[in-house]
């Protein structure tokens, strides 16, 4: 059985969901049969690599003129000096220009990027680069200046939801509307992640609900998280800490845990809670993820409540 991410991988530019303005620019390149050096940047699961491969295939129609590399595996200067440079110098019959797709280019060493800039300068007439990265600020500035930068934003939730409905119906996956909404929320604009979660639902013996999603993903129960917040807002501190400590001992990832608190606050429609939890989320996402960070957040919630009294 094919994985959903493979089965539903777009084969044409118009099949890629989201980022319509960027897709229009890429379509114009296909129509003109030409392209500059390109830098695709944006979060995971937004179609960068798929778009690059479709663009290369439509322009070349010839695999001999295409080199695909993942820079996280081949990130050093030797790759530039041997693989990339030799490919750029090679002649390919009936090929106006060659294309090098370099995925995860932001993982390349500075020395490797400096060497690659030189290759881009010398061979720009017969070889074009498509660099793909999550964080474009990690790309050497002289390389950025030689590329047209196309930004891929997180895919809108409504777009992901529509696509998941189509796929779940086509695959015969019985899933509640609430569960689909949760899948969309958990994927955070990442189409690939949403398909991976849906993949885990295929063998469900019954209708997939929110509890099933939470179980397979390994997240804390939203009801338990909401109860912790409710206890804090009622200033029942001892009970709230006891409930939280039980959740903490289950060894959830701190980032998953703080995101669960954030979702609970959204459901409770409390702007003040969202603000406090959002600040804690920022600290934890930067790697400061001890239990004390959560205790500090709880203190801020209590302080927030006392100011309202």
Swiss-Prot record:
This protein's source sits in the domain of life called Eukaryota
Binding-site positions, ATP: 5, 17, 42-50, 134, 192
- A molecular function GO annotation: ATP hydrolysis activity
Compartments (UniProt record):
Nucleus
Tell me if DNA-binding is a UniProt keyword of this record.
yes
Could you give a single Gene Ontology term from the biological process aspect? DNA strand elongation involved in DNA replication
Per UniProt, which keywords does this protein have?
Answer: ATP-binding, Cell cycle, DNA replication, DNA-binding, Nucleotide-binding, Nucleus
What are the record's GO terms for cellular component? DNA replication factor C complex; Elg1 RFC-like complex; nucleus
Does this entry carry the keyword S-adenosyl-L-methionine? no
Q: Name the InterPro entries on file.
A: AAA+_ATPase, ATPase_AAA_core, DNA_pol3_clamp-load_cplx_C, DNA_Rep/Repair_Clamp_Loader, P-loop_NTPase, Rep_factorC_C, RFC_lid
Additional remark text? Present with 2760 molecules/cell in log phase SD medium.
Summarize subunit and interaction data from the UniProt record for this chain.
Answer: Component of the replication factor C (RFC) complex.
| Function text | Component of ATP-dependent clamp loader (RFC and RFC-like) complexes for DNA clamps. During a clamp loading circle, the RFC:clamp complex binds to DNA and the recognition of the double-stranded/single-stranded junction stimulates ATP hydrolysis by RFC. The complex presumably provides bipartite ATP sites in which one subunit supplies a catalytic site for hydrolysis of ATP bound to the neighboring subunit. Dissociation of RFC from the clamp leaves the clamp encircling DNA.
Family membership, please give it: Belongs to the activator 1 small subunits family.
- List the PANTHER family hit by this protein, alphabetically: REPLICATION FACTOR C / DNA POLYMERASE III GAMMA-TAU SUBUNIT, REPLICATION FACTOR C SUBUNIT 2
Protein name, as recorded: Replication factor C subunit 4
The protein's organism comes out as Encephalitozoon cuniculi (strain GB-M1) (Microsporidian parasite)
* Designated gene of the protein: RFC4
